[in-house]
A protein has these predicted regions:
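Generic signature of intrinsically disordered, low-complexity segments enriched in small/polar residues
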Residues: 9-11, 24-26, 49-52, 62, ...
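N-terminal substrate-binding region of glycoside hydrolase catalytic domains
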Residues: 1-81, 202-236
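An active-site-proximal structural segment forming one wall of the substrate-binding cleft
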Residues: 27-41, 62-110, 133-145
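Catalytic-core regions of glycoside hydrolase
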Residues: 1, 35-37, 108-117, 122-236
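A generic structural signal for short
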Residues: 18-19, 85, 127
Length: 236
């Protein structure tokens, strides 16, 4: 039986000004709906989701440069080095923690905010992604804001392996295990984060093109269609 639900939430639905937040309309309805079904919500705030409208809050629309791209269905990537955007992100994280740390309706908060889908990358435009210092500041802002609620980030980058943060594999059973260095489990091993599961949650999303048959008894496995149980057992 299912006990968790997942939601991507644009930052524009959670924040309407530098110190103005709209959790009541942007988050409460989702949390209450999940609770009514006996579930907890796993959520990820985002700014840039390919194919969808930008999640940049309106009050920043004239302040932050947006870079157009065509990959992944197209979209607009914000200038993450913009001081007003940085300030807004830190303000959001702080208020988010004050309002929701320890809220029993939340299962896990995936940090999101940065990169395509909130996945902490802008591939193939790697130079658009913020540098290690800002990445670390966001990671630590979340850890400082949330003392009880579980956290996850997409990759074991900068100082995340040493923080109270787990990891999520958004291509689960597609590029989870194996000898390819950018696959999920090898990146955990390389970052010495493969024991993180003992204290922090490991999760993710079954790669969309695998979802239709990954649980079939007679599935034909391949390099990019991996054994689900093996992936679960390896990553814990």
């Amino acid at each position: 039986p299912a006990s968790l639900e997942f939601a991507y939430i644009p930052l524009s639905e959670l924040m309407s000004g530098p110190t103005n937040f709209t959790f009541e309309t942007g988050l409460e309805t989702r949390l209450n709906a999940a609770e009514e079904r006996g579930h907890q919500l796993v959520l990820r705030p985002y700014i840039d989701y390919p194919k969808l409208d930008s999640g940049l809050p309106d009050f920043l629309s004239d302040e932050v440069e947006m870079r157009a791209y065509s990959e992944h269905g197209g979209g607009f990537s914000p200038d993450y080095e913009n001081p007003k955007l940085k300030s807004a992100l830190f303000a959001f994280i702080e208020e988010f923690g004050q309002e929701y740390d320890g809220d029993s309706r939340i299962g896990v908060i995936q940090l999101g905010l940065l990169g395509f889908w909130g996945e902490w990358h802008t591939w193939p435009h790697e130079d658009w992604f913020p540098g290690p210092e800002f990445q670390s500041e966001i990671l630590n802002a979340y850890v400082n804001a949330f003392n009880q609620t579980l956290l996850q980030v997409r990759y074991p980058i900068v100082d995340s392996p040493n923080l109270r943060i787990g990891f999520h594999d958004d291509s689960f059973a597609y590029s989870t295990v194996g000898d390819v260095n950018w696959y999920f489990h090898p990146t955990l091993v390389a970052a010495e984060a493969n024991e993180s599961w003992r204290d922090n949650p490991i999760g993710g999303e079954i790669r969309p093109e695998l979802q239709w048959d990954i649980f079939d008894e007679n599935i034909n496995l391949s390099i990019e269609k991996q054994d689900f149980d093996l992936c679960v057992n390896t990553t814990h």
